Amino acid sequence: MRADRRIVGASKWPLAIDPAKVGTYPADTKSGAGYFYDDVLEYRVWVHPDKGGEPLNGDHDYFIAFAQCEPAEEYSKRIAGAEPPLVLVRQFEWVDEPNRGQFVPEKGERITEWQVGWLQGNKRTATSIQEFLKHPIEAGP
């Protein structure tokens, strides 16, 4: 697995909280959910050899990790078999939805992959979860 820890100019999206750790997080994480994030850990571009990607991990899928979204987007557009970037986020508090419309606040540490667009407006603040529970929405991460 490879990592690009560089920060290149301004970014539309949050940067990795610790660029030195980009590429060190586990490949197997949760996927989606939680509604709020605390930290961006890295951006990931998953590459699929069965869809034309270079077989760097035999015929198994793999990802390249980035500290910044824009280089990840550029990479995903020029590499065969690559998906658009995902973002690995850390959550210390989040909202679980065990059943549609049933929202449960949770605390702990959770690492999950999100669609990059879910970052917009979903950085957790001291009151985010309480406000969400007053007026829940069924959309987003």
Summary of predicted features, one role per range:
Residues 1-61, 69-141:
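Conserved NAD+-utilizing ADP-ribose enzyme module
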Residues 65:
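Basic, glycine-/proline-tolerant helical and adjacent loop/strand elements
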